[in-house]
């Protein structure tokens, strides 16, 4: 009889602890850290053997396991299925129209997964990115030559989930985003700044050995690089979107000028990041003569 009463007391204690644990979990549901473990039962564990888990610990494990399962089912069901279906539909439509471009995106994705801190993997990723950008540029040219209206192009981009903003400048926004990343301060500034600082000494050392025309080109290169660095140095965290866009257009124009001047000296070009000397002409960013800035950027 005493044993039965003891068992009933243990069960009652476990039920009370479980109830307190559930109430605490509901109160702290949004907190990152779990609630403190409930106080141990009155039965002390045997110090000579492994400690037994209390009913409260077991209940807590079951609670967190059920929460994890709940969120996993949530993200693995309707939301994920819908997003996956939309993406697969968009990629299928793109594959029918531009199979080569889809293949390049797949290669780019694989290269991004392999990229590391070594120069070889970075070079592989950059090379793949260049091919993808060239494909995007060619695709943009084909679309422009096809006579398709901007409204039709915008609708096509929206079908691929690539629309941005209020409808203005939505033609190939992914290309603009990639170019903004490639021409950002983080990518360009460190190497360009180092080359710019070393250029004057190099020019003095090679002034007499270079043909006058080539020497002038190198001088102009140095000047353009300095202007690009000045644009990056003028950046502030509080810059408005309009200011950032205007600066991007200036940097893009200066990079085109730099491209027109040819490659920098090999002694200095070695300071450039692997694969940074991509061909801006291949991206068709300059646009037709007389085109305004927005058309040039294919934004």
Swiss-Prot record:
Regions of compositional bias (Acidic residues) in chain numbering: 16-27
A Pfam family the protein falls into: Pex19
Superkingdom in the source lineage: Eukaryota
Record flagged with keyword Acetylation: yes
Keywords: Acetylation, Cytoplasm, Lipoprotein, Membrane, Methylation, Peroxisome, Peroxisome biogenesis, Phosphoprotein, Prenylation
GO molecular function, one term: protein carrier chaperone
Residue numbers spanned by region Disordered: 1-63
Lipidation (S-farnesyl cysteine): 296
Residues that bear Phosphothreonine: 236
Quaternary structure (record): Interacts with a broad range of peroxisomal membrane proteins, including PEX3, PEX10, PEX11A, PEX11B, PEX12, PEX13, PEX14 and PEX16, PXMP2/PMP22, PXMP4/PMP24, SLC25A17/PMP34, ABCD1/ALDP, ABCD2/ALDRP, and ABCD3/PMP70. Also interacts with the tumor suppressor CDKN2A/p19ARF.
Protein's name according to its UniProt entry: Peroxisomal biogenesis factor 19
Organism phylogeny: Eukaryota, Metazoa, Chordata, Craniata, Vertebrata
